[in-house]
Swiss-Prot record:
This is Phosphatidylglycerol--prolipoprotein diacylglyceryl transferase. It is found in: Cell inner membrane. PANTHER family: PHOSPHATIDYLGLYCEROL--PROLIPOPROTEIN DIACYLGLYCERYL TRANSFERASE (PTHR30589:SF0), PROLIPOPROTEIN DIACYLGLYCERYL TRANSFERASE (PTHR30589). Catalyzes the transfer of the diacylglyceryl group from phosphatidylglycerol to the sulfhydryl group of the N-terminal cysteine of a prolipoprotein, the first step in the formation of mature lipoproteins. The chain crosses the membrane at residues 24-44, 60-80, 96-116, 122-142, 182-202, 207-227, 241-261. The lineage of its organism: Bacteria, Pseudomonadati, Pseudomonadota, Alphaproteobacteria, Rhodospirillales. The gene is lgt. NCBIfam families: lgt. Pathway: Protein modification; lipoprotein biosynthesis (diacylglyceryl transfer). It comes from Rhodospirillum rubrum (strain ATCC 11170 / ATH 1.1.1 / DSM 467 / LMG 4362 / NCIMB 8255 / S1). Belongs to the Lgt family. It is an enzyme of class 2 (transferase).
Length: 274
């Protein structure tokens, strides 16, 4: 080991009052959801015609939150630690012990969004486009929280100047892969989709943004996984791939299908509108 940046000594607990503690991870969820709520309102109002009312956006936040938490937890249980939870089923609802899966959360949010739109008679494609536009914002804050917690760290990288020794990652300096993911899945995808929505006619054919999000996230995750240490209970799979990469491949394929189908549809009959 020639050089390693010191890992910032940040307490995972932001505020502790008696038996109650607010962790950075919880704060990341709150900031991501509230930021997404505000941005969804902004995008809906700018659309012509508006995608939904402000009251609908408020209700969608509740549906999306439940979908994220339930789907994320069940996804982790099924994809990443099924044997453990089969032996200890009472631990499944113990979210404070950690263990959430993005891919499970995605399925949960999609399910919640479809059910919500059907209950309000809203366009699934138009609402879905807005959800896809705001999702990278939540991913950005979530990955920053992973970094603060010192979890989901990268693979050993003793020759990388910005490598860090993580508290639970052994003596070797490692890639700060959480920051890579925050950049790719968060900032880059957020800016790219936002620019496409603002300066192209993609929103005239609802569903195209959804497809691009699925493709963009899948490619970003597969790339970041080359630097991220796989989960200890799973390790590397066949040919050295990781579970995250395997789960991201169907996302890319689904994104291509969604984009092509949406692109072939008739555009919204709103001259110059979004």
């Amino acid at each position: 080991m020639l050089f390693a940046l010191p890992f910032p000594a940040i307490d995972p607990v932001l505020v502790e009052i008696g038996p109650f503690a607010i962790r950075w991870y919880a704060l990341a969820y709150i900031v991501g959801l509230l930021g997404g709520w505000w941005y969804t309102r902004f995008l809906s109002r700018r659309s012509r015609p508006p995608v939904m009312s402000d009251a609908d956006v408020d209700d969608l936040l509740v549906w999306a939150t439940l979908g994220t938490i339930l789907g994320g937890r069940l996804g982790y249980v099924v994809f990443y630690n099924a044997a453990h939870f089969l032996a200890n089923p009472l631990e499944i609802p113990m979210l404070w012990h950690g263990g959430m899966s993005f891919h499970g959360g995605l399925v949960g949010v999609i399910t919640a969004t479809v059910l919500f739109c059907r209950s309000r008679r809203l366009s699934v494609a138009r609402v879905g486009d807005l959800v896809a536009l705001v999702a990278p914002l939540g991913l950005f804050f979530g990955r920053l929280a992973n970094f603060i917690n010192g979890e989901l760290f990268g693979r050993p990288a003793p020759d990388v100047p910005w490598a860090m020794v993580f508290p639970h990652g052994g003596p070797l300096p490692r890639h700060p892969s959480q920051l890579y993911e925050a950049t790719l899945e968060g900032l880059v995808l957020f800016c790219l989709l936002g620019l496409l929505w603002r300066f192209t006619a993609l929103s005239r054919k609802p569903g195209q943004i959804i497809g691009l999000f699925l493709i963009g996230y899948g490619l970003s995750r597969i790339t970041a996984e080359f630097f991220r240490e796989p989960d200890a209970q799973i390790g590397f799979l066949a040919l050295g791939v990781t579970m995250g990469q395997i789960l991201s491949l169907p996302m890319i394929l689904a994104g291509i299908v969604v984009f092509v189908v949406a692109r072939r549809a008739k555009p919204l009959a709103v001259p110059g509108g979004r």
